[in-house]
C-alpha cells in the first residue's frame, strides 16, 4: 500500500483491508534499542535495513523482567543486537581501565541474558558493533576494553570522522566461513566506530574476519547455530543508497523465516525420544508440552 496524500483514511483502510489476504507473513525481528537520557531510540539504518530485507522490526525496551524477556523471545523469529555504549568489564571478569568510556547498565544485563536465552531457543542472531561484543561476552569470551592501549602494535583508524554511510578500511574474511558465504567475497570495505573489540572468541565461536591490524571484525557460531556478529555498522550503508551490506540482513531474514516455519511445525508435532530401550511409564496428568521435573522434558 502506498502512502496516500489525500488524507482519506477510509480509502486507505479499504485498500489495505482488500489486500490483506494477499499479504505474505513476514518474519518478526526483535531489535535492542539504545536507552539514554530517559529516551529509547533506534537509528533509522537498523529498521530500514530490516524492512528492505523483507522482515518486520520490533524494538525491545530495557527490562530485566524474566516474563517479559521470555514472552518477547517466544514471539520473535530473529534477533538483532544494535550498537551503543561500552560493556561493563565486570561482566567479563575485568576491572575498568582508565580508557573505558560510557557504559549502559540498562542494556548490559538484559542483552547478555537475551543472547543466551535466544541461543538456547535456536533463534537466529545478528550482532552489530556493541552487539558482537555482547555475543562474545555472553558466551564466555573476552574483550579489549580499549584496543589502542591494550593491543600491541600500530592500529589503523577505527573511529572514522568520515560519514557513517561510507567505508574507511578493509577487512579480510576467513575462507570457508559463514560470513564469506553471505558476502560472497574474501575482502570487504567497512566503516568503523569503536574502541572496544573481541579479544578471544568465546567457546563455540570462531573468528571469521579481521582488520589489517589484527583487530577481530567478525565472529560466528561453530555449533551450527545461526549466530553472527560483526564489528562494523552495516546498517549505515543503506542510508546512502549503498546495498553492499544488505546480504547480512537478507541472511538474518532468511534464517528467521526458516525458524518461524520450524516453530509452527513444532507447535503441531511432538517428538518423544526416550534414549532407552525399555518401556516408559508416566503418572497421570503428565503434560509433555511443558517442563516437568519428573520427566525432564526439554523444550
PLM region descriptions:
Residues 192-197, 229-234, 271-279:
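Histidine-centered catalytic micro-motifs
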